[in-house]
Amino acid sequence: LTDAYLSLMKALQHAGYQAGRKIVISWIESDALEEGNELCDSEAWKKLKAADGLLVPGGFGERGSEGKMRAISYARTQRVPYLGICYGMQLAVIEYARNVLEEKQADSEEFEAGGAGPHFVVYMPEIDRGQLGGNMRLGGRTTYFRQDIPSLLSPFYQNAPSFSARHRHRYEVNPEYVERLEAAGLMFTGKDESGVRMEVLELREDVHPFFVGLQAHPEYTSRPNKPSPPFVGLIQAAIQHRQSLGTSASTAC
């Protein structure tokens, strides 16, 4: 795991250095959050409930997605700081659609089950569905913060109008459902140059202290002397979360 997620680990450590804290990473197998754990008394759930923040990284495929969404739901409802990267952003959208919009069949076109949907995450229009190799949206891309609504993430980028980060994906938030999601409180504060592709999602600060998703992979440009802004935000929120709880941990599930 340390090799597979090395960039994420380093980004967390860099943010910890800036905050003067040692970051302890607790790995959770998302499959263990799924079936048979309704009482939330498994070791995986104990780890999740003891965490000061939650990071769901990029990934592929349906395996483990239900467990990841249960973890995201926990973080959202219990106000635990959350950062979703790429797939972690897309799953946050589906979780919100299922549990807030009550679209219980909401899913992604990536899921092998191929259900009837509604598909809140879809193939990007420029992607050739018949060829999975060599057709991803790759490399550095610019994300533009919206100027008509406040953003929790923007101050960590010194309120710059935009930022650049590397991308690696072939799916995106379905633009057909953006208006509905925003009406229910899930705000898309960053978009690509077209204004159609969603790049950053957030819950308002009065609703949640730090609930952020990015389509990009900001961990790749994190450095010890210049930590990645979203990870700085996550760690700062996690510190505040721990301080607010004192020595007691959240026990809801």
Describe the residue ranges of each PLM region.
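N-terminal beta1-alpha1 cap of cysteine-dependent amidohydrolase-like domains
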Residues: 1-210, 215-253
